[in-house]
Amino acid sequence: MAEIKNYTLNFGPQHPAAHGVLRLVLELDGEVIQRADPHIGLLHRGTEKLAESKTFIQSLPYMDRLDYVSMMCNEHAYCLAIEKLMGIQVPERAQYIRVMFSEITRLLNHLLWLGCHGMDCGAMNMLIYCFREREDLFDMYEAVSGARMHAAYFRPGGVYRDLPDVMPQYKVSKIRNAKAMARLNENRQGSLLDFIDDFTKRFPTLVDEYETLLTDNRIWKQRTVGIGVLTPERALNLGLTGAMIRGSGIAWDLRKTQPYDVYDRMDFDIPVGVNGDTYDRYLVRVEEMRQSNRIIEQCSAWLRANPGPVITDNHKVAPPSRVEMKTSMEELIHHFKLFTEGFHVPEGEAYAAVEHPKGEFGIYAISDGANKPYRLKIRAPGFAHLAALDEMSRGHMIADAVAIIGTMDIVFGEIDR
């Protein structure tokens, strides 16, 4: 009798559910996955090596381009590492702004994940619902930094500038008349904090809408319940973090276990799963969105009541204000030197990690006393998660591989670096 051979299938990198440039070599027995071999490196840009030839401040925009869905969270870890090396104290107001925008970034990430994960499994309408809310969040990014995605807003020692008193408004154009503009500008009449407060009031109801569409949906449950199960022990041994480990029932969240900035003052809960399957990870991330909304509300209330500086007064790191720079020759020279030569970081090494939307995102920086890092190592959560794909997908159907890739929430900017 002829020997039965397994069938090898190439999944991606052009596949619409590959989430970027994932190439999977699947070994199949009929339609059942026997082995999954992920091939990475198709988006490698040498970020860690590039950082060695750039000053510390010049490397900051590269961080936005790692996980290009969670921009400010990447910047946060990078700034924390430099601050740890230099012993810089960040003003309280800047810490609250950072925490607020880290949570806005978490919402941006989770909304894209929910829309794409739903669409991968056949719920086409989820993407439209989620992008409706992402538009408002991008407007918050644009108001503080001028960019909708790659913000480069955080700085070692604080943030680039304070929150604006006026929210940018839509203008009448060829494609939008005055009536449509008036409707879009209704909640943009005040400051950025007014706009954020309006969003946080509406958002819990909008999350309820998403849950109405998916949580008790019979087809959604058939696609996710019992798929990609990970026991707490295996999740720990595989080095998983974020929603991947919390979905398996382990309440590990750096915002609680190793709080940074002002997270120790925030009142929020850590959602955890029970079964460790794709459905539990979905529930964990949806509840995380509600908790992020709570944190944003608390930050907004504090920021209203407490004006103050938003960047350190250590002038070795912080540039002079625009007014000072345009009235004093010394300040102009200081500004020029700071942005051409950069600042020198004392010899040493530091590791800083943040609770990124995808897990523990860490920056390990080594300084030799120069104005550039001697070595910069990026700890990407998605890298460890992708390594677990083989174990999670064995014994499942090809169609389930799409649900498992979706539940990992992988982005190749950070994996390939």
From Swiss-Prot:
GO cellular component term, pick one: plasma membrane
NCBIfam families found in the cross-reference section: NuoD (TIGR01962), PRK06075.1 (NF004739)
Compartments reported by the entry: Cell inner membrane
UniProt organism field: Leptothrix cholodnii (strain ATCC 51168 / LMG 8142 / SP-6)
GO molecular function terms attached to this record: NAD binding; NADH:ubiquinone reductase (non-electrogenic) activity; quinone binding
The name this protein goes by in its record: NADH-quinone oxidoreductase subunit D
Cleaved signal peptide residues: none
Function field: NDH-1 shuttles electrons from NADH, via FMN and iron-sulfur (Fe-S) centers, to quinones in the respiratory chain. The immediate electron acceptor for the enzyme in this species is believed to be ubiquinone. Couples the redox reaction to proton translocation (for every two electrons transferred, four hydrogen ions are translocated across the cytoplasmic membrane), and thus conserves the redox energy in a proton gradient.
Catalytic activity: a quinone + NADH + 5 H(+)(in) = a quinol + NAD(+) + 4 H(+)(out)
InterPro entries the record matches: NADH_Q_OxRdtase_suD, NADH_UbQ_OxRdtase_49kDa_CS, NDH1_su_D/H, NiFe-Hase_large
Pfam families cross-referenced by the UniProt entry: Complex1_49kDa (PF00346)
Alphabetically ordered keywords of this record: Cell inner membrane, Cell membrane, Membrane, NAD, Quinone, Translocase, Transport, Ubiquinone
Gene: nuoD
EC number of the protein: 7.1.1.-
HAMAP family xref list: NDH1_NuoD
Membrane topology: Peripheral membrane protein
Stored PROSITE patterns: COMPLEX1_49K (PS00535)
Main location: membrane
Similarity comment: family membership: Belongs to the complex I 49 kDa subunit family.
Superkingdom, taxonomy of origin: Bacteria
Oligomeric and partner information: NDH-1 is composed of 14 different subunits. Subunits NuoB, C, D, E, F, and G constitute the peripheral sector of the complex.
